[in-house]
Amino acid sequence: MKTFNLPLLVALFYLFVSVARSQGPIDITKFGAKPNADATSALLAAWKEACAAAAPAKIVVPAGEFLLNAVKLQGPCKAPLTIEIAGNFKAPADVAQMKGEDTWVKIENVQGLTITCLPTGGTFDGQGQAAWKQNKCAQSGMCNSLPYNFRFNTLTNAQISGIKSLNSKLYHMGVMGCKNITLTGLTIDAPKDSLNTDGMHIGRSNGVHATNSKIGTGDDCISMGDGAVDVHVEGITCGPGHGISIGSMGKFANEAPNTGIFVKNCSFTDTDNGVRIKSWMNSFEASASDLHFEDITVTNVLNPVIIDQEYCPYNHCKEKTPSKVKLSKISFKNVHGAAKSAEVVKLLCSSAVPCDGVELADIDLTFPGGAAVSQCKNVKPIVTGKQNPVACGAPATPAAP
């Protein structure tokens, strides 16, 4: 009499069910996407199917040029999800066609997202040239009236690689409320005179790695707002733009602290700033600590190393009381190269809450036009290694707006 191995049968049954549930790649052309035509509804349909899949799913964007209007790709999804992009997308040039949306491509509330762009694809052209003329930030101080290229909101365990973001109407990328997210191999590009086209803005996120990317914009290559914790920025080539900035801090009440930020092995060419920490005058109380900048190379940079606690762009500060943002445990190590101005180091700290625990180590910065100077105010840094120019050789003067 034959006997049956019940545990084996049960295992085979569940294996069969798992295989039955799995599916091949979900190609957006399955939903009607065609090159040189609008792929918005097709991408949304592909996302809906992939997000509902019980097993890990993959969305495929084949080679070709596609038009894309504003999309929201929202979770939660039932399983991890991958988007593989061989094609390229263009946004509407006319911002009115985006119907008031604050973002071109918004992805949010997803665990286990992977975006991989093949060498031939992954270009997202925001076509921001016309929109930049509508930017009234300098006049009104209202700087969020145009859409980002991307917002990555509340993503957990995400891997994003190879995106090429061009000509965003406002910021290229926002990373908000994320946990354990890596963004690598990015190309971010907009002209140096494009207003407020920050390459990447990180806020209220924990465990962010931004690595091995080339960023050239009309604003900060990377900026970090409040609540940026355990952020690692490494291997970034920045220029043109305004450098890599922590802040501006203190503009709003109840900002979350910034802590554990590491910027390493980055180079800056033809930028307004290199590495910068900034907080508003007449600010609310806030804090930032454990901020470290190391192995920094500058070429023709206006302010290679700067702490600016008298930040007030466009002269919009009605009062000019000292900043209440407390800065502590900060280091600048192995910073070298040639500056565009004589003021190569400017540590302009608040008189209300002077900076604590600032370290300058192995600074070698020159100004081809004459003698370089290191300026300090309301700070007594710890100085080690080579110091060219002499650390804190002059009092700090206000930074250029």
From Swiss-Prot:
The keyword Cell inner membrane does not apply. It comes from the Eukaryota. It is found in: Secreted; Secreted, Cell wall. GO terms for biological process: carbohydrate metabolic process; cell wall organization. One of its GO terms (molecular function) is galacturan 1,4-alpha-galacturonidase activity. Its EC number is 3.2.1.67. The keyword Cell wall biogenesis/degradation applies. Glycans are attached at N180, N265. GO terms for cellular component: extracellular region. SUPFAM superfamilies: Pectin lyase-like. It catalyses: [(1->4)-alpha-D-galacturonosyl](n) + H2O = alpha-D-galacturonate + [(1->4)-alpha-D-galacturonosyl](n-1). Its main location: secreted. Gene3D superfamilies: Single-stranded right-handed beta-helix, Pectin lyase-like (2.160.20.10). The active site is at D219 (proton donor), H242. It holds the Pfam family Glyco_hydro_28. PROSITE patterns: POLYGALACTURONASE. Disulfide bonds join C221-C238, C349-C355, C376-C392. Belongs to the glycosyl hydrolase 28 family. This is Probable galacturan 1,4-alpha-galacturonidase SALK6. It comes from Kali turgidum (Prickly saltwort).
